[in-house]
Amino acid sequence: MKRLRPSDKFFELLGYKPHHVQLAIHRSTAKRRVACLGRQSGKSEAASVEAVFELFARPGSQGWIIAPTYDQAEIIFGRVVEKVERLAEVFPATEVQLQRRRLRLLVHHYDRPVNAPGAKRVATSEFRGKSADRPDNLRGATLDFVILDEAAMIPFSVWSEAIEPTLSVRDGWALIISTPKGLNWFYEFFLMGWRGGLKEGIPNSGVNQTHPDFESFHAASWDVWPERREWYMERRLYIPDLEFRQEYGAEFVSHSNSVFSGLDMLILLPYERRGTRLVVEDYRPDHIYCIGADFGKNQDYSVFSVLDLDTGAIVCLERMNGATWSDQVARLKALSEDYGHAYVVADTWGVGDAIAEELDAQGINYTPLPVKSSSVKEQLISNLALLMEKGQVAVPNDKTILDELRNFRYYRTASGNQVMRAYGRGHDDIVMSLALAYSQYEGKDGYKFELAEERPSKLKHEESVMSLVEDDFTDLELANRAFSA
């Protein structure tokens, strides 16, 4: 199937002004387009335009947006809905039917305006939102086009075994978009279509290994929005280097999966072991302290890290296991009192009401910071990693602490999502205790961590649809023939 391309006239119908990278994507006729772009660079918007164009330019076309989760698929799906509803007002020989809960959109095509006497339906185009976490639900369809969003987070087997076969009968096209996540299959597909020569951030980009069916596009966020370059460079001060290079620089970074790439910047302090405590320094009346408390469950350890807010150093760390809730709280209270009644930042998630009630009963000054989701955990860990890269994290020079930091890694789940956890059957209690403590630290450059609000899992129609548009229409005459009376 020959891929049609949109005209400038079609862009005008949508009020859409594509930037240079979006325009290159729209003008490409490759069957497999791979777009590796930084965050907020318009790749999702361009993808929504591609879908709208097919639904109108090819009556009867069938296409899907596939993302790691339904919530992610709903983003582009919502944008497509908004654009389709807008175009339906321009082309009276079309009728839109939306089944939002099923993420299903139908565009009915008629031989004349819908309200004209004798109007007959001649074809129906269909667009659906799908999740890659259930590959078996992707099998069996016959499609004209597929859009893969955040493709780097989708396992290759989902593409090769479930998605690609749906395009075989009609020789359909695929638009594969993502920010990079290491050197996985998305990286390999990108190289198959890259013709831009040697470029920083793309390993082996100077090696010509392209495939005629592929074309790839690459841009950092500031390449797309050069007027905002200063803003992006400021973000680099507040985001771990690896995360910044991947998310905004769109770099394919090869790494050992270690979350803490700044371990060589870690400040190591001599300490004295006192029972279950590693003591770097005793209480100083003129200093302010806080304690990051990660309570142990089952075989986990309980770890309490005392942070000197004036120096940014962990001056005491207590680690224990096998203790009852009451014993853990009693130890925490004693530690707090030893450091001038230091206030506590406690992860109270998953330990029930017992800990909270015990903390209240003991009169401990604490702030609950429940690590109730991967989002909260990632924000806390990213803050710790950033401070470490800046040389602002100081801990006791203890092998257990260093091993736990070194073995805290990124992993990919079966559904393609990226998670952080300890290697193998290791523990992450020290990591979480440190992250909780340093969430209260104002860095030497004035940076202060703030926990961002979590995004709702479901978006209302008005919120999930954006009025920004990106579309492509090859030939307006084709559209006129399809929709005129």
Swiss-Prot record:
GO molecular function, one term: ATP binding
Swiss-Prot/TrEMBL keywords: ATP-binding, Endonuclease, Hydrolase, Magnesium, Metal-binding, Nuclease, Nucleotide-binding, Viral genome packaging, Viral release from host cell
Comment, domains: The N-terminus contains an ATPase domain. The C-terminus contains an endonuclease domain.
Protein name, per record: Terminase, large subunit
Statement: the UniProt record of this protein carries the keyword Hydrolase: yes
Chain residues that bind ADP: K17, P18, H19, H20, V21, Q22, Q40, S41, G42, K43, S44, E45, R79
Residues that hold ATP according to the record: Q97, Q99
Comment on bound cofactor: Nuclease activity requires 2 Mg(2+) ions per subunit. Also active in the presence of Mn(2+) or Co(2+).
Organism: Thermus virus P23-45 (Thermus thermophilus phage P23-45)
Gene Ontology biological process terms in this record: chromosome organization; viral DNA genome packaging
Residues the UniProt record annotates as site (Modulates nuclease activity): D300
Active site: E150 (for atpase activity)
Leading EC class: hydrolase
Subunit-level organization: Interacts with the terminase small subunit; the active complex is composed of a pentamer of terminase large subunits and a dodecamer of terminase small subunits. Interacts with the portal protein.
Motif window: Walker B motif: 145-150
